[in-house]
């Protein structure tokens, strides 16, 4: 896990979202950063490497959507600098499910 993934995982593990999540979960051959089964929600933490993978990320997100999953993407710097806001954004998505 990257430092940002670890920080988000620690918050999620301490029930910051009020649901159980699985880190590094395999879905259809892809390893997603976090999966929240109760909400069919995937959380991806994107670092600088993802800037060059926009097309790949879009295909992956589209395939996950086709499976009925919602994908929330957050950037490393958001998790490291504004964790409360990231968690609130994730909660808002979960509330709509």
Model-based region annotation:
Residues 1-97:
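Nucleic-acid endo/exonuclease domains
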């Amino acid at each position: 896990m990257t430092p940002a993934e670890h920080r988000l995982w620690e918050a999620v593990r301490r029930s910051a979202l009020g649901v159980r999540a699985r880190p590094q979960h395999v879905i259809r051959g892809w390893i997603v950063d976090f999966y929240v089964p109760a909400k069919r929600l995937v959380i991806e933490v994107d670092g600088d490497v993802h800037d060059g993978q926009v097309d790949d990320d879009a295909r992956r997100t589209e395939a996950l959507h086709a499976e009925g999953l919602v994908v929330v993407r957050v950037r490393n710097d958001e998790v490291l600098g504004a964790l409360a806001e990231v968690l609130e954004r994730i909660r808002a998505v979960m509330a709509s499910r």
